[in-house]
Amino acid sequence: MWNKHGIIYSDKKAQLPVLEERNCSWRIYFTSRNKLNQNEGYFIDVEKGNPYNILAPAKQVLVPGKPGSTDSAGVMPTCKFEDKLYYIGWTIRKDVPYFNYCSVAKEKFNAKFKKRGPILSPDLIDPGFSGTICVTKLNDTYMGYYLSCNNWIPDENNKLQPSYSIRLATSDDGLNWTNIWTMSGDQG
C-alpha cells in the first residue's frame, strides 16, 4: 500500500525522480529546466525514512552537451545502477519535435559523473529514438528495459506525438548493449 506524503522538495520544474538507496540516506536524482528551457540533472540527499529532512541541497550532476552532440538540448537521469547514471540525451529536430538517446555517465568520485554517451542508437530494431531506460541485473547480465519510438502520429491539433514500444536490451558491462526483445507485441 502506497501512502502519499506530499512535496518533499520544491522546484517548479522538477520531474522524473530516481531513488538511490545509500548507507544512511536516500539520494534522489531528478531533472529541472534551466533558463534556456533545457533539462539538467540534479540530486538531493534526504534522510532515509524521513525524506522531509534534506541533508544536502540540490547539486547539479549532468548538463546539456555542446551543439551537435546527442544531448545538446537536455539531459534527464532515468536510472542509477552501481556506478552508472543512465539518462536521456535530448536533441531538437526539424522533421519531428525532438529526438532522444539512451545514454550513460560513469561516476568518478563524490557524485561527479563523466558522460560516456549513447548506449542505444537508431538501428534496424529501433528505427526511431530510445529513452527512459531502467537497468537491473540478473545473474551476471545487465537487463535494460527502455522505450523505443517507432512512429510519430499527429494529434487532434496536428502536432506530432511519439508512439512507443517497450523493449529489452542486455549487456555484460552496462555500457555495451544488445537489443533483444519487444514487450508491446509489435516487431518494430
What are the language-model segments listed below?
Residues 1-73, 79-128, 136-188:
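Beta-rich carbohydrate-recognition and catalytic domains
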